């Protein structure tokens, strides 16, 4: 846009030229995420996607939307913006993965008070990397510059994912039975939940981003900005050869709120807390925040980012498959009969 035509809008705090510069910067990055289903280019009013429905009897679309929450405050504080886009993708694709869906495409929304092209390009590069890890296309997005809506240097993110699953292969937990095995797959850290408390604990500790995290060989900034794991490749590999009865993306609400979402009312989950390795960041939060492990499991993933529930006769094979894909997995519990409907549906043995 010519300077004369855009001057009034620029004077009002919206720099259209900066927006155009951002599109030019990210165009090739976004294009590299495109899969065979993408039939439109960046810059159109809508993204076009033609799904491959071969082999599907009753294709069902599955959608999810999410954000990154106050983990963004850590990005602002530590001046590192290239990984929160991965978090954004992970939060939505892992959610639809729970129902057995294959992610098709992703849309992002980036909002800020004053557009910093370098920062925005760094964020969108992370979104593209997340899409690459999830084998889905970054089909489109929106960049909103809104003066006076955000503090200087801050922004917010939202993401939207659409995936596909055959109706006969939807994973909904209805086939879970007493005796089934619960497999936990390692998280990379806090993922994208519990950061309001984590940041409060950090402020009280007196540590800064460059300090080593107690019990770890990494800095505070590195640990707190470690991106959320994307479990698409692992889960799809397991689904090709084994029946998964139920899955859980361990997000806000931890074990106690998320596991019951996939359990039939007649059963409960028995979790053995000592069955997996808890990363140092959670031990630090426990001690520094003066918390208990039940409180921790209500807030954080505590080292388990994703759960699969399978028949006991395939548990060892599934564990072998996951571990062979350079991820850590453990049998962390089993399904029992629910004897008291007034009690928690997740019972943890500490």
Curated annotation (Swiss-Prot):
Pathways per UniProt: Purine metabolism; IMP biosynthesis via de novo pathway; 5-amino-1-(5-phospho-D-ribosyl)imidazole from N(2)-formyl-N(1)-(5-phospho-D-ribosyl)glycinamide: step 2/2
Domain of life, source organism: Bacteria
Location in the cell: Cytoplasm
EC top class, as a word: ligase
Reaction it catalyzes: 2-formamido-N(1)-(5-O-phospho-beta-D-ribosyl)acetamidine + ATP = 5-amino-1-(5-phospho-beta-D-ribosyl)imidazole + ADP + phosphate + H(+)
Enzyme Commission numbers on file: 6.3.3.1
InterPro entries noted in UniProt: PurM-like_C_dom, PurM-like_C_sf, PurM-like_N, PurM-like_N_sf, PurM_cligase
Main location per the UniProt record: cytoplasm
GO biological process, alphabetically ordered: 'de novo' IMP biosynthetic process; adenine biosynthetic process
Record-level GO cellular component terms: cytosol
This protein's UniProt keywords: ATP-binding, Cytoplasm, Ligase, Nucleotide-binding, Purine biosynthesis
UniProt-listed SUPFAM superfamilies: PurM C-terminal domain-like (SSF56042), PurM N-terminal domain-like (SSF55326)
GO molecular function, one term: phosphoribosylamine-glycine ligase activity
Pfam families: AIRS, AIRS_C
Family as reported in the entry's similarity comment: Belongs to the AIR synthase family.
NCBIfam families noted in UniProt: purM
Protein's UniProt name: Phosphoribosylformylglycinamidine cyclo-ligase
Species whose genome carries this gene: Nitratidesulfovibrio vulgaris (strain DSM 19637 / Miyazaki F)
Lineage of producing organism: Bacteria, Pseudomonadati, Thermodesulfobacteriota, Desulfovibrionia, Desulfovibrionales
């Amino acid at each position: 846009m010519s300077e004369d035509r855009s001057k009034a809008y620029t004077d009002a705090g919206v720099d259209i030229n900066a927006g155009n510069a951002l599109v030019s910067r990210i165009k090739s990055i976004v294009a590299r995420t495109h899969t065979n289903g993408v039939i439109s280019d960046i810059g159109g009013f809508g993204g076009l996607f033609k799904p491959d429905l071969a082999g599907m009897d009753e294709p069902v679309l599955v959608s999810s939307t999410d954000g990154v929450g106050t983990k963004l405050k850590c990005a602002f504080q530590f001046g590192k913006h290239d990984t929160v886009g991965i978090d954004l993708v992970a939060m939505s694709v892992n959610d639809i993965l729970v129902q057995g869906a294959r992610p098709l495409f992703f849309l992002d929304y980036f909002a800020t008070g004053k557009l910093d092209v370098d920062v925005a390009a760094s964020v969108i590069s992370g979104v593209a990397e997340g899409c690459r890890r999830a084998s889905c296309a970054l089909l489109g997005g929106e960049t909103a510059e809104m003066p006076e809506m955000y503090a200087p240097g801050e922004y917010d993110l939202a993401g939207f994912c659409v995936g596909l699953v055959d109706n006969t292969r939807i994973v909904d937990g209805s086939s879970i039975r007493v005796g089934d095995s619960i497999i936990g797959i390692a998280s990379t850290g806090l993922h994208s939940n519990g950061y309001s408390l984590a940041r409060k604990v950090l402020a009280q500790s007196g540590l800064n981003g460059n300090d080593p995290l107690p019990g770890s060989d990494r800095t505070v900034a590195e640990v707190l900005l470690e991106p959320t794991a994307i479990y698409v490749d692992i889960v799809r590999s397991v689904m090709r050869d084994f029946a998964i009865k139920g899955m859980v993306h361990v997000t806000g609400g931890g074990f106690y709120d998320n596991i019951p979402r996939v359990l039939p009312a007649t059963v409960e989950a028995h979790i053995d807390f000592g069955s997996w390795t808890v990363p140092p960041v959670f031990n630090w939060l426990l001690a520094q925040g003066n918390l208990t492990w039940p409180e921790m499991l209500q807030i954080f993933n505590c080292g388990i980012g994703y759960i699969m529930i399978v028949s006991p006769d395939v548990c060892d094979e599934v564990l072998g498959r996951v571990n062979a894909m350079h991820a850590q997995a453990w049998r962390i519990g089993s399904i029992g009969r629910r004897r008291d409907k007034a009690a928690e549906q997740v019972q943890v043995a500490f």
